[in-house]
Amino acid sequence: MRHLLLATTAVAVVLGGTMAARADMAAAEKFLAEEINGLSVLSADEQKAEMQFFIDAAKPFTNLEIKVVSETIATHEYESKVLAPAFTAITGIKVTHDLIGEGDVVEKLQTQMQSGENIYDGYVNDSDLIGTHWRYQQVRNLTDWRAGEGKDVTLPTLDIADFIGTSFTTAPDGKLYQLPDQQFANLYWFRYDWFNDEQNKADFKAKYGYDLGVPVNWSAYQDIAEFFTGRDLSRLGVEGKVYGNMDYGKKDPSLGWRYTDAWMSMAGMGDKGEPNGLPVDEWGIRGNEGAQPTGSCVARGGATNSPAAVYAVEKAIEWLQKYSPPEAAGMPFGEAGPIPAQCNGAQQMFWYTAFTAATVKPDLPVMNEDGTPKWRMAPSPHGAYWSEGTKIGYQDAGSWTLMKSTPVDRAKAAWLYAQFVTSKTVDLKKADVGLTFIRESTINSDHFTERAPKLGGLIEFYRSPARVQWSPTGTNVPDYPKLAQLWWQNIGDAMSGAKTAQEALDSLCAAQESVLARLERAGVQGDLGPKLNEEKGADHWLAQPGSPKAKLENEKPKGQTIAYDELI
């Protein structure tokens, strides 16, 4: 690698001009020394070799101004404020990395898809859109890009095999459509210290007949929520009312993700399968063997309005009303996420690990003096309709996406930036800040072995083979932007009480089928587009094996728990 460094440096000096090459490498060396500061899985020489590649590959684009966009989370803030200016200094490509809401990212992307106008040169777009991108073919697939048009700007040491989320961004055609930039799962969060308190353990066992521990099923989660809500924990130094659940319920785009992000599969609505249920996925959309969506309502073989889906929504509403802070019902995702760190919540079933960085700050009431957390994260419990082999949770994989409507020079410059912020040189430091892991080499680094005790189970989760059971939206969803907006609007009606859960889900599945029917009529997705089943009625489909599933006589079986220390 050192020989490569010397050779590429020599070429840069001869071809690019001695002063310019030195200036670029000077900026790179400053970045490596002051920002990376040894926190990389690569050696110093290997880091410099990667920087030299970026310097050389960027020469045709010097002074080109590009714009990229992502949602606003800690990882992307670090990219926008630290990595983007460093990339500009090193390469001469002037990159503006905008931070906007996740719903706005999807809206901008949808506008670019519909208009053909180049709004952004690169998007960090959730892999939930893999089915959309595969069908519309409006993004550059990165398999062909890296071998063809983008070959001269592809980092030789990118090492696609090191990325843990490429199964989420690869379509059934075997092509990679997006490059993961950050990933986070939704897991179960709980107060480890409260659960291990002897008085709490004894009182819980006396009341419910089984041990207080990490809930395996929703029945146990509900019992624990009931047990802690209103419980006096002043003897543990806890002031104010204690709550047994935290969630959010504002009628806002983030309410849609709350349900499409695998809540229904956690309840047991969909079919078995990894990374997503087939033929019925966690949106309740049924697909045929040719990957064509065939229905969403039970009458067409879908499950969006099935008994399991109704159960999923009713339980969330019940727990929000009975066991959560009153203000939670009016909160969106962004406001609710940091709340557990404020001390008075016992547990949260649907907690995004993207909030880990904000929840391990040393001055928080949920942290011990030695820097270890009073809380832990664990696998989420499953609902009454769930069975082994069914998806158990969601994992967000925000991934670099290059639109075909972006001019090639701008796409190449954006691709260089995308690789810079996901490179092995940078990734360990970026993960140390944002804790949203994308590379195996970073997860398994000595650095995170040392940090693991202070991260509440995050490293143990990502080092576990079970992590593949947490996955993003799959390929049954043919047009994510059009379908996603239907969820928050209809679920919002159930949350507000304007409709029952059944009525809201009947409306939702009908609205989804309306979109599927329009796509089928338009024929814009060819052989991969929807092909709706004839309606056969709910009784026919509920009698078939798999999803949709008939209503259970008992939706609250006995609670089951497991001790956290035994679990890990």
Question: Which role fits each region the language model picked out?
Answer:
Residues 170, 174, 321-324, 362-442, ...:
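Extracytoplasmic/periplasmic substrate-recognition and gating elements
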Residues 220-226, 265-330, 380-383:
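Glycine-centered hinge/linker elements that transmit conformational signals in sensory
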Residues 24, 61, 82-163, 198-199, ...:
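Extracytoplasmic "Venus flytrap"/periplasmic binding protein-like
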Residues 25-60, 127-187, 374-380, 550-568:
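Hinge/lid segment of periplasmic solute-binding proteins
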Residues 127-139, 143-147, 163-210, 222, ...:
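Periplasmic solute-binding protein
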Residues 51-52, 65, 373-382, 431-495, ...:
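Long, aromatic- and glycine/proline-rich binding clefts that accommodate carbohydrate-like moieties
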Residues 99-108, 216-220, 327-341:
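Short helix-initiation/N-cap motifs at beta->coil->alpha
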Residues 51-57, 74-92, 189, 193-195, ...:
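Short, polar/charged alpha-helical segment
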